């Protein structure tokens, strides 16, 4: 009876693990679409300056002047960038991977990687698997010259080639970029911030990030950070 119970318990446990894995893949296939959480467009003001003295980074505020996101980089071109919320909690971690020194690829993870628990190998691999991969377009490849980067979803099926989930077109250098989904619909946009007075100019250090309904603002800001690493 004991052996039979253990066998049944193991089967149920493995089934739950498989179910959780399928659920995680389904969530990854949807991310960063967050239907029902953002019903109107959100406009954020992005300041290319850290709140910490002697740091490179970003400060992001909403239309009411409230701090939403912050980034503090202690080196100019880091291989890891952490997006934090207003209280300093990590939202997303981005890590750089280079292939042959040509392709600039960044993998996006939920939360802060360094502080994750190590309870089991299964949970560890699930937490440490990236959500998305953002790759800079290589200019020598044929295609749309307006494209700056591609966003790919990452799944457990590493052998299957996937089309980009999102395409980033425009010019980050001039702060005129759009993030387009597979149907070429704009889900986020980087725009220059217009001043009320003609005598005032914000330049490229202060700009706007407009996030359309249904798209994750945190991931939209992560794209801004990666474009800055790729093109600044």
Predicted regions and their residues:
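Low-complexity or membrane-interfacial segments used for flexible interactions
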Residues: 1-69, 73-79, 86, 103, ...
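An anionic oxygen-ligand recognition environment, strongly enriched in 2H phosphoesterase
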Residues: 107
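Polyanion/phosphate-binding surface patch
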Residues: 69, 91-93
């Amino acid at each position: 009876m004991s052996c039979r119970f253990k066998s049944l318990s193991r089967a149920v446990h493995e089934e739950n693990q498989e179910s959780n894995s399928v659920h995680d893949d389904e969530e990854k296939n949807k991310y960063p679409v967050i239907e029902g959480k953002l019903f109107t467009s959100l406009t954020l003001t992005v300041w290319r300056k850290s709140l910490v003295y002697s740091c490179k980074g970003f400060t992001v505020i909403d239309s009411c002047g409230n701090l939403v996101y912050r980034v503090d980089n202690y080196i100019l071109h880091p291989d890891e960038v952490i997006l934090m919320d207003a209280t300093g909690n990590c939202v997303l971690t981005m890590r750089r991977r280079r292939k042959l020194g040509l392709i600039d690829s960044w993998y996006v993870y939920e939360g802060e990687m360094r502080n994750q628990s190590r309870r089991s190998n299964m949970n560890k691999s699930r937490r440490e698997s990236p959500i998305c991969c953002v790759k800079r377009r290589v200019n020598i490849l044929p295609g749309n010259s307006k494209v700056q980067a591609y966003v790919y979803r990452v799944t457990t099926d590493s052998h299957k080639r996937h089309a980009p989930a999102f395409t980033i077109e425009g010019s980050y250098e001039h702060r005129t970029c759009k993030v387009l989904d597979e149907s070429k619909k704009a889900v986020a946009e980087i725009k220059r911030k217009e001043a009320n007075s003609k005598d005032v100019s914000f330049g490229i250090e202060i700009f706007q990030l407009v996030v359309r309904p249904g798209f994750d603002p945190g991931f939209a800001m992560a794209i801004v950070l990666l474009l800055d690493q790729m093109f600044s």
